[in-house]
Amino acid sequence: MLIWLVELSDKVQLFNLFRYITFRAGAAMFTSALIVFLFGPAIINSLRVRQGKGQPIRADGPQTHFKKAGTPTMGGLMILAGILGGSLLWGDLSNVYVVAVLMVTLGFGAIGFYDDYLKVTKQSDKGFSGKARLGIEFLIAAIAVFFMMKMALASAPHGGTLGSSIAFPFFKEFVINLGYFFVLFGAFVIVGAGNAVNLTDGLDGLAIVPVMIAAATFGVIAYLAGNAVFANYLQINFVPGTGELAVIVGAVIGAGLGFLWFNAPPAAIFMGDTGSLALGGLIGSIAVATKHEIVMVIVGGLFVMETLSVIIQVFWFKRTGRRVFLMAPIHHHFEKKGWTESQVVIRFWIISVGLALLGLATLKLR
């Protein structure tokens, strides 16, 4: 919103700063963190009063989790408030990518909110119907991908088809044009990312830090991919307009830091599906916009690992009646093995940092 003040920069030199994405990304981070810090306590108290027993605790989960009974959920509302505030204030709302990513974030957040609401009111870990939830997620994601694809095709240099193509790391020229089938592929990436983060969110601080790490990584990628000079130097695909997504990433990091203040063990609040679905969808959307969907598998490798552990567990149990892991997602397996919660969380953070660095390395290895 404030970017429009650039038009007055000839009268007020200070407004010229709003021209720079890096400045606005930093300002968005500060703004979103401030919003969460200021309104977080009131939101937590309100949710605690309204929810009573808080988020239901799985009966088959680790014994250490029962002491968390009564902790309110839906903390994603705090995160969404920060992201929305920082993005609306400092982002370019005329940018199609910005609007599409925010649409996915809010849409997935609304789905997660309804899911959390059902779980809290029923005091059950069974919320929104799985098929209905996935169907709505795919619809929201497909609409966003369609508009991002159209934007990428319209702005592609020399009438290229990058917007409807899958790009691969290490090989700039190797792309596969899917045509309109790219909408389905992109929607799958976004929905997969949203639900992968959702599965990861099971311990205090476990999901939010890897989310910030992955978001920061894609913020760098978005900034570079949206800059013709940097994209040409690194031999990555140039996608005009995606640099503006770095501002949203700044808001994500700020909101994430603010939320972590309250989510650090012992957590005063859980983000719930409200936050995890929204954040995962946001990261997946940026990966699709910047044509780094495959790199998403590397950068978000922790989320992929958590998801695969559930898929393997369910598949093998249905097939043989036996379990591969003591409990899934895999972070619970390590708890059952005797790791403390802090050991699991910090070690998974370390894995996230390593995967993020590996993902960034793909930008240079061509």
Curated annotation (Swiss-Prot):
The keyword Lipid biosynthesis does not apply. It is found in: Cell inner membrane. Catalyzes the initial step of the lipid cycle reactions in the biosynthesis of the cell wall peptidoglycan: transfers peptidoglycan precursor phospho-MurNAc-pentapeptide from UDP-MurNAc-pentapeptide onto the lipid carrier undecaprenyl phosphate, yielding undecaprenyl-pyrophosphoryl-MurNAc-pentapeptide, known as lipid I. Its EC number is 2.7.8.13. Keywords: Cell cycle, Cell division, Cell inner membrane, Cell membrane, Cell shape, Cell wall biogenesis/degradation, Magnesium, Membrane, Metal-binding, Peptidoglycan synthesis, Transferase, Transmembrane, Transmembrane helix. It comes from the Bacteria. It comes from Agrobacterium fabrum (strain C58 / ATCC 33970). This is Phospho-N-acetylmuramoyl-pentapeptide-transferase.
